[in-house]
């Protein structure tokens, strides 16, 4: 049995979709901003190590809370681990591609392009769960795509101008600028696969929030450590500049932030649906994007403003469409 130990009167809000959505919004803002702080240095090349530290902090925090009696979740066993391992592989792919995206893209552009994940998930739910996509939803998807194209245009121009000042006008910028879009595209598909498989596996295993959180992170540890050992430079010259006291402190803080996002992700998927979970993230992009303007690499131009507003509008349209579909199904 996995549970947050609360009183009888508090059980109502623990199972409330609106409370889960608000908690997910707050934790996703915290996670995005803390990861951007860590990844803002383009020379940072220890992504797997960063993700390993985040997952390790999350696992240690959970175990400490369990010992203190604040939370309860299933003990580790081989059967559950074997059933959940494919989800952990998807999680590693999702968080790695997310960290690489944040390394090359500004927070506003990153959050806008994450909208495209919703389209992939929506059609994934058609295949996996027999849901349908209506005309209003298609309209919101079209707005998401348009907002992403506008954001990409404004960000490209801003990035080229910034790189010209840094590297000189004679350097080719196409690879440097476009690599971020490759990583965000990979992240969209990895995120969709993770959410869809997790929802299906939760139905099979009857995992609760802390079970999901514990197994997601503990099974990721060997994968992340192996990835760091195989693909990252562990020489003293490379390791010391990236793992000094300031960077290590920020990594630990981002690990604590990952505790919140790990729990709230599983919580939100359990009490709502995987598409609603992703749509909330899309609606949440407005405060995330505005917060992202605190960073110097975020483009402040008309394209950025238009893309954010269009993306936000697409979220509202989608939410209305889902509400109408729910009301129609209740009438039948």
From Swiss-Prot:
Q: Where in the cell is it found?
A: Golgi apparatus membrane; Cytoplasmic vesicle membrane; Endoplasmic reticulum membrane
Per the record's keyword annotation, is Kinase included, yes or no? no
Gene Ontology terms describing biological process:
transmembrane transport
**Cellular component GO terms, alphabetically?**
cytoplasmic vesicle membrane; endoplasmic reticulum membrane; Golgi membrane
Stretches in topological domain Lumenal? 34-47, 106-108, 153-174, 233-248, 296-300
Carbohydrate-modified residues are: 170, 247
Annotated Pfam families: UAA
Q: Which residues lie on this side of the membrane: Cytoplasmic?
A: 1-12, 69-84, 130-131, 196-211, 270-274, 322-332
Membrane-spanning parts: 13-33, 48-68, 85-105, 109-129, 132-152, 175-195, 212-232, 249-269, 275-295, 301-321
Q: How does it sit in the membrane?
A: Multi-pass membrane protein
Keywords per UniProt: Cytoplasmic vesicle, Endoplasmic reticulum, Glycoprotein, Golgi apparatus, Membrane, Sugar transport, Transmembrane, Transmembrane helix, Transport
Q: Describe the function of this protein.
A: Involved in the import of GDP-mannose from the cytoplasm into the Golgi lumen.
Summary of subunit composition and partner proteins: Homooligomer.
The protein in question is named GDP-mannose transporter 2
Q: Which gene is transcribed and translated to give this protein?
A: VRG4-2
